[in-house]
Amino acid sequence: DELKFENINGKEVLYHKSVIKGDSSKNLLPVIVEKFISSLSFGKSMRWGGFSYEFIRPIRSVVAILGSELVDMEIYGVKSKMAFYPHRNYGYDMVEFGSIDEYFTALENNGIILQASKRRQKILNEFKAIEQNSGLKIELDEDLLDEVVAITEMPTALIGSFEEEFLEVPSEVIVTSMKENQRYFPLYDQNGKLSNHFVVVSNAISSDSNLIIKGNEKVLRARLSDAKFFWESDLASEFSSAKLKNITYLAGLGSMYDKEIRERDIARELAKIYEKELKYEFGGDFIDELDRAVMLSKADLTTAMVYEFTDLQGIMGS
C-alpha cells in the first residue's frame, strides 16, 4: 500500500511518499556535525590511540554549543565539554568556561586565536613591520600563507638570516628549500635580488624570540649546506643526456633517453616545416642549436639537485 503509480509526462512512475517528522536542532546537530567531519577528505590522514578513526590530526577536545547550552555529542570517541586545551606554552590541563562569550575570551587568554582571518591579519601586519624595519620585501606566497595560518594558533612572524656564501647556490634552490622544507618566506632587496634573510611564522610563545630565530637558522643552515653540496657535485659532473638511459620513462616506451631521441626527431621535422621563419629569427645554424636544446632539455633529471628537489626539474638545466 505504500507504493503508488503515477503518470508523469506520459510515463508511469512507481514512487513512495513518506513524511518525516521534524526534530529539534539540539538533536539534529550531533548527526549533522558527525556527517560533516566524516565527509572531509585530506591528502593524508592518520589514526591515533587504539581507534580506527582517521582524520588529519588527532581530535583532542570538542566544544559544541547551541545558544547557551552544551550539545551532548561524541565525535571520534571524544565527548563535548565546556572546556578546551590551551596553547602548549600555557599548559596541558583543560580550561573550562561558562558561556560562549567566556569561550572566546578564554581562548585568547590561553594563546589561541580561533578565527583564521584574525590569525592571517596578525601575520600580514607583522610582515609589514618586518619589511619597514629591514628595508626588504617579503615574497608573499598565498598558498604558503594559507598553510601557516592553518597550522598556528598564535602566529608570530620573526626574521632570521643565513650566511651569504649560500647565495652562490641558484636562488631557485634556496627558495624551494625555504618554502617546501621549512615553510619560510624569502626576503628580497629593493632590486628584486634574493637576500640572506627569511621570515618564519612561529607558533611558539616565548619571551626570548632570539632563541626561536637561532633554532630556525640552524635548521635552514643544514638544509642549505646540503643544497650547496648537491650543487657543487653537479657542477663537477659531466652534464650529459646519456645518463638518461638509466631512467625509465614508461613501461613499453623505453627510457627518458629514448623519449629524448623521439623529441629530437620531432623537433627536426618541425624545423623543416618552419625553416624560413626560424632562419630569420635565429640564423643559419638554428637546427644544430635546436637539436642541442632538446638534447639537454631532460639532462637535469640525472642531477643530484633535481633528485633532491624534484620541482626544480627543467630549471636546473637552464
What do these predicted regions represent?
Residues E139-I261:
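Catalytic nucleotidyl-transfer cores of nucleotide-processing enzymes
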